[in-house]
């Protein structure tokens, strides 16, 4: 086992990364090894997808399968060995199908089929034991003793960034949005990573390519969400329980939320969003469901307590899931799509009857708690509509600064930095937030500036796209470079989606971003210095010191 993809990975003077019997996330060594093997198989599929495409052979099933299966290897997504094995076997079948199509097309056109790299030739074991015996070939740091540590760090930056992009591709696909050019570029990069490079410049340029690719994917996902559910609008949301039977929907998949709402209508069940599903409450399509009563709980890391106290059924539509046995609710939590936990019921298809039955058999909430409201829904359209008013307030001096404070949440005590930063931001500043990092301060009262709320919740982590559109619009209005705006980005990171959002921002030329609370363990000190020199990327320090720098206070 070697896994170093998330913030909570082991860090010691002897080296970084989880490499023992179990990772800090709870992932067992065998699961980690199987995931690495799955990635290796998927890279082999992409090798053939690239070669087949060169001859005009495109398999759209492969184009959707590879990102989806890759998504299952993100932090806190799938801990079920049998599901990972099934993905690996399916990958082997797709690779063989593409291989046959490629070779047949070569023969028909009189071309000689190319010799493929080892990553496209592995004969997958037939049993779990055989697959685990093959794991060393796919270990991410297998050649660490023969390469510079910066090379390994760059490879991992690319791999983890592409994982995040794959997740957003799958989110878009669920909403019916795919793109053949995006798929082609994804396969090309996936295949490149399958043949470990030692070219630092090529790896760095690939990281920027991944950022650019993800920008296109986020635009695709934005279109999918707004076409399906309308444009989010400022919405007041209750964050306290309401009397009645209950279902909690977590993750990012709003299509699943829609299905659950349709199937629970008239059944006396209240539906709540959780974590990254909170922004769904701002979409017009969901406002026709009176039994979508609000948001329950906070970010992913608190779920073992919050789900244990939730008297109903819980559905995990995507990341993040952690051990449900701790809070003894494994019998009433359900997984969907790429999510998996051993022993937890996995819902396939679009029938949520088993979830509904579980909700009805539980007590539900016995009384209404006193409401606590927050306001959400300041995504792209709402921000653009408010832009003229914002510009006027900037010009008259009422608004002097903007902060984007968001990203992933986590349980490290150092993350109080983000709460303190939001609370310490000057009263003449606007705070934009997104992702589950918002839960560090989204229930606090920040007031307004001439009717403009000082806290603007943009949405899910992928809604960084909305923030980028606002920044571009403001830079055009003020006729300045995006980096000359009175705007500072402070991003909390935990896993691979945050990595690819960061790569997206860097690839667009956004500079002087702060990330925290700790830098990715796979980035060497030298790589961190290069990123600082090139982009002004730096780690958070203290709120007082960072604010002085961001506000240019002497």
From Swiss-Prot:
This is Hydroxylamine reductase. Its cofactor is [2Fe-2S] cluster; hybrid [4Fe-2O-2S] cluster. The modification Cysteine persulfide is found at residue 408. It comes from Shewanella oneidensis (strain ATCC 700550 / JCM 31522 / CIP 106686 / LMG 19005 / NCIMB 14063 / MR-1). It catalyses: A + NH4(+) + H2O = hydroxylamine + AH2 + H(+). GO terms for cellular component: cytoplasm. It is found in: Cytoplasm. Gene3D superfamilies: 1.20.1270.20, 3.40.50.2030. PANTHER family: HYDROXYLAMINE REDUCTASE. Hybrid [4Fe-2O-2S] cluster binds at residues 252, 276, 320, 408, 436, 461, 495, 497. The keyword Glycoprotein does not apply. InterPro entries: HCP/CODH, Hydroxylam_reduct, Prismane-like_a/b-sand, Prismane-like_sf, Prismane_a-bundle. [2Fe-2S] cluster binds at residues 3, 6, 18, 25. Keywords: 2Fe-2S, Cytoplasm, Iron, Iron-sulfur, Metal-binding, Oxidoreductase. Catalyzes the reduction of hydroxylamine to form NH(3) and H(2)O. It is an enzyme of class 1 (oxidoreductase).
């Amino acid at each position: 086992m070697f896994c170093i993809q998330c913030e909570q990975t082991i860090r010691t003077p002897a080296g970084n990364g989880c490499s023992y019997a179990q990772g800090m996330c709870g992932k067992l060594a065998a699961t980690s090894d199987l995931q690495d093997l799955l990635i290796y198989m998927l890279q082999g599929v992409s090798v053939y997808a690239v070669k087949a495409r060169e001859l005009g052979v495109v398999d759209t099933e492969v184009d959707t399968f590879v990102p989806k299966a890759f998504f299952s290897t993100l932090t806190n997504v799938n801990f079920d060995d049998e599901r990972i094995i099934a993905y690996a076997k399916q990958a082997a079948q797709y690779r063989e199908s593409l291989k046959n199509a490629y070779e047949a097309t070569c023969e028909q056109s009189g071309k000689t089929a190319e010799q493929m790299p080892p990553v496209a030739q592995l004969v997958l074991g037939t049993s779990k034991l055989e697959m685990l015996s093959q794991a060393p070939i796919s270990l991410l740091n297998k050649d660490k003793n023969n390469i510079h540590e910066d090379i390994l760090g760059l490879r991992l930056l690319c791999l983890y960034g592409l994982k995040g992009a794959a997740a957003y591709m799958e989110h878009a696909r669920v909403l019916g949005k795919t793109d053949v050019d995006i798929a082609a570029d994804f396969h090309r990069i996936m295949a490149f990573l399958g043949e470990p490079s030692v070219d630092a410049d090529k790896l760095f340029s690939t990281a920027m390519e991944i950022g650019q690719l993800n920008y296109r994917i986020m635009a695709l996902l934005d279109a999918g969400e707004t076409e399906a559910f309308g444009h989010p609008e400022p919405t007041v949301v209750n964050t306290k329980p309401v009397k009645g039977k209950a279902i909690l929907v977590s993750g990012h998949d709003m299509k699943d939320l829609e299905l659950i709402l349709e199937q629970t209508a008239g059944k006396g069940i209240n539906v709540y969003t959780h974590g990254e599903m909170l922004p769904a409450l701002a979409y017009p399509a969901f406002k026709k469901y009176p039994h979508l009563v609000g948001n329950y709980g906070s970010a992913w890391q608190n779920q073992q307590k919050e789900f244990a106290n939730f008297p109903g059924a819980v559905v995990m539509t995507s990341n993040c899931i952690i051990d449900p046995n701790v809070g003894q609710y494994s019998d009433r939590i359900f997984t969907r799509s790429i999510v998996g936990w051993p022993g937890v019921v996995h819902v396939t298809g679009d029938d949520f009857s088993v979830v509904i039955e579980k909700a009805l058999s539980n007590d539900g909430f016995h009384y209404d708690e006193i409401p606590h409201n927050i306001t959400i829904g300041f995504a792209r359209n709402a921000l653009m509509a408010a832009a003229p008013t914002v510009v006027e307030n900037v010009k008259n001096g009422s608004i002097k600064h903007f902060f984007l404070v968001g990203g992933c949440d986590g349980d490290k005590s150092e993350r109080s930095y983000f709460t303190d930063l939001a609370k310490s931001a000057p009263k003449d500043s606007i705070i934009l937030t997104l992702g589950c990092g918002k839960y560090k301060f989204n229930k606090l009262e920040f007031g307004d500036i001439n009717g403009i709320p000082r806290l603007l919740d943009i949405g899910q982590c992928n809604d960084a796209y909305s923030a980028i559109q606002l920044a571009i619009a403001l830079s055009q209005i003020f006729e300045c470079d995006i980096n000359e705006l009175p705007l500072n980005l402070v991003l909390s990171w935990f896993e691979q989606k945050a990595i690819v959002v960061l790569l997206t921002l860097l690839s667009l030329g956004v500079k002087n971003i702060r990330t925290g609370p700790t830098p990715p363990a796979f980035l060497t000190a030298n790589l961190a210095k290069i990123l600082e020199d090139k982009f002004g990327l730096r780690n958070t320090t203290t709120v007082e010191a960072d604010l002085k720098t961001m506000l240019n206070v002497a």
